[in-house]
């Protein structure tokens, strides 16, 4: 799973809440971590979203 950092978001519906630089898995599951680099994820896996992230993974699992 990607590391959450500054300006990272988490949430499986992308109604995402901002998490702090000191990521805490009590705030959100690491597998639902999204960052400005375009990570998307579900409870099974994380993978990198490309520019066309809507075609790479479901929109409801993506943040940008």
From Swiss-Prot:
Glycosylated. GO terms for biological process: positive regulation of cell division; positive regulation of mitotic nuclear division. Keywords: Chitin-binding, Glycoprotein, Hemagglutinin, Lectin, Mitogen, Repeat. InterPro entries: Chitin-bd_1, Endochitinase-like_sf. Pfam families: Chitin_bind_1. It comes from the Eukaryota. Residues 1-20, 22-45 form the Chitin-binding type-1 domain. One of its GO terms (molecular function) is chitin binding. N-acetyl-D-glucosamine binding lectin. Shows low hemagglutinating activity towards human erythrocytes. Has low mitogenic activity towards human peripheral blood lymphocytes. This is Lectin-A. It comes from Phytolacca americana (American pokeweed).
């Amino acid at each position: 799973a990607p590391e959450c950092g500054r300006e990272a978001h988490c949430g499986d519906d992308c109604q995402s809440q901002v998490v702090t630089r000191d990521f805490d898995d009590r705030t959100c599951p690491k597998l639902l971590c999204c960052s400005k680099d375009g990570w998307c994820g579900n409870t099974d896996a994380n993978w990198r979203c490309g520019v066309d992230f809507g075609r790479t993974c479901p929109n409801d699992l993506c943040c940008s």
